[in-house]
């Protein structure tokens, strides 16, 4: 095994990128970046019925959106191609043949019906089913009968153990393992076999994956031993639980879909910040930048306790990044959400940045921000009649007229210049600014709630704001 650090993320393209998969990819990526290693993406596409190009694209798109960039793999190439398991079948067959020739694996001709009967009998007798080794010493090859290839476990007593970077030392007795299936009759490798061959040939030095794979590690270690290969280190990550404290799953939890968060207006910076803390922490730090993640992350700091999905914390982090990232950056990301709501704005339109500055204190997602911005982009306004009756009186409309005329005369609109007009009119009338601002707010938004009045006028744009003020004045 090579001494240089090499880690991998090996998803199956049978659906979208799962939050658990994204965390595994992130941890491996950060570890490689911190310690000068290489991060490999390998596609385990041997489930021929469920693997699809659409799922592969969804996984790659999810990683790209999160900016988890791989060094070797699909679209990149590398020194150990191919990076798709279905393109490596000859390699798996070669090693299976070697193991059979060495007496460390064998062909099993037991039918599914026979195995089903034995499994039912074991259940009836209250014992755990283990393959009894029926074909272990079989020499004949029944004509026309399909077979699988099984690993031949040692017959003597013994145990297999490993030191997990997260869980510590774990041991299992040989007697708890049976002769597991390595390869199907059609030459497709099963998980425990294929990943060992690939991890060794791709010189992987550390395998990080979810705790649900702990039990898979023992047969894999036996295979490493049979092949005379040095196994990598292992780090098994804690489970992620949904808000209901059940294991986060594609079937039960919509939160499991990485790209759904993008569609809902969550920023990738916020999602990464949230996900890294599902099992890892750095003191009491809540907000962690990408550079800090790279500088701080280590598997020795990963806990064994399950992380629980907290939607409020994700929204809190998202609003933090909406407030602190450059407004021009957020403006570019806001544009697609406005377009989806029927209000496309060209790239660089100054209103985009105005919306960000005015709305980011209240909006928790890009989608919320876009929803708040829509009234400023619509033609015309629907007045709340109660608000209009209270604030658009004959006396208040006189103040509205003054604001309208003085604002129209401004050579350039800005928050400062518009606030100055409101202040001047209120001082001249001897009333508080609210007595002037609130009628203006109702006239242009239809209700009594909005950002600051200068910001609100600026967001509306000069032409539309004046049209709405004129419409309100026409009521009087």
Residue ranges: model-predicted function:
Residues 23-26, 269, 434:
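Short, acidic loop-beta-alpha module within alpha/beta folds
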Residues 331, 388-446:
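C-terminal accessory/binding modules appended to enzymatic or scaffolding proteins
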Residues 48, 215, 227-383, 390, ...:
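Catalytic adenosine-cofactor/nucleotide-binding cores of aminoacyl-tRNA synthetases and other
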Residues 28, 59, 99, 103, ...:
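Residue-level signal for inorganic ion chemistry
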Residues 106-236, 241-248, 257, 261, ...:
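Active-site cores that bind ATP or allylic diphosphates and position pyrophosphate for catalysis
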Residues 8-13, 41-45, 202-207, 256, ...:
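Glycine- and acidic
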Residues 93-98, 102-104, 136, 270, ...:
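Residue patterns forming the tRNA-binding/recognition surfaces of aminoacyl-tRNA synthetases
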Residues 2-124, 215-229:
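N-terminal Rossmann-like or analogous alpha/beta NTP/dinucleotide-binding catalytic cores
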């Amino acid at each position: 095994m090579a001494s240089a650090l090499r880690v991998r993320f090996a998803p199956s393209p049978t659906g979208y990128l799962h939050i658990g998969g994204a965390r595994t990819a992130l941890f491996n990526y950060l570890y490689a970046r911190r310690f000068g290693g290489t991060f490999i993406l390998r596609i385990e596409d041997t489930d021929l019925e469920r693997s699809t190009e659409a799922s592969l694209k969804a996984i790659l798109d999810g990683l790209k959106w999160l900016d988890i960039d791989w060094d070797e793999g699909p679209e990149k190439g590398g020194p150990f191609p191919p990076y798709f398991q279905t393109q490596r079948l000859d390699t798996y067959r070669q090693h299976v043949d070697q193991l059979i020739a060495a007496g460390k694996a064998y062909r099993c001709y037991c039918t599914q019906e026979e195995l089903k009967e034995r499994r039912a009998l074991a259940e009836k007798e209250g014992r755990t089913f283990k393959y009894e080794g029926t074909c272990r010493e079989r020499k004949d090859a029944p004509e026309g009968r399909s077979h699988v290839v099984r690993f031949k476990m040692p017959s003597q007593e013994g145990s297999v153990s490993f030191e997990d970077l997260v869980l510590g030392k774990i041991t299992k007795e040989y007697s708890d393992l049976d002769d597991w299936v390595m390869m199907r009759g059609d030459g497709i490798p099963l998980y425990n076999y294929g990943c060992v061959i690939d991890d060794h040939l791709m010189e992987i030095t550390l395998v990080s994956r979810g705790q649900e794979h702990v039990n898979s590690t023992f047969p894999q270690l036996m295979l490493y031993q049979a092949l005379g290969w040095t196994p990598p280190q292992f780090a098994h990550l804690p489970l992620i639980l949904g808000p209901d404290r059940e294991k986060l799953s594609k079937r039960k939890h919509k939160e499991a879909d990485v790209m759904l968060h993008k569609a809902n207006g969550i920023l990738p910076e916020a999602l990464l910040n949230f996900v890294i803390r599902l099992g890892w922490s750095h003191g009491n730090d809540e907000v962690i930048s990408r550079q800090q993640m790279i500088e701080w992350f280590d598997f020795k700091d990963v806990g064994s306790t399950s992380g629980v999905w907290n939607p409020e914390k994700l929204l809190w982090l998202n609003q933090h990044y909406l407030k602190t990232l450059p407004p021009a950056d957020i403006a570019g990301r806001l544009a697609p959400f406005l377009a989806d709501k029927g209000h496309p704005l060209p790239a660089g339109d100054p209103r985009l940045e105005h919306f960000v500055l005015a709305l980011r204190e209240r909006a928790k997602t890009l989608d919320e921000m876009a929803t708040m911005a829509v009234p400023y982009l619509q033609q015309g306004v629907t007045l709340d009649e109660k608000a209009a009756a209270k604030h658009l009186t004959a006396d208040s409309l006189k103040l509205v007229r003054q604001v309208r005329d003085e604002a129209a005369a401004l050579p350039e609109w800005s928050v400062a210049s518009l606030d100055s007009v409101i202040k001047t009119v209120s001082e001249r009338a001897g009333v508080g600014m609210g007595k002037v601002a609130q009628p203006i707010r109702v006239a242009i938004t239809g209700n009594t709630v909005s950002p600051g009045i200068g910001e609100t006028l600026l967001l509306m744009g000069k032409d539309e704001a004046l049209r709405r003020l004129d419409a309100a004045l026409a009521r009087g």
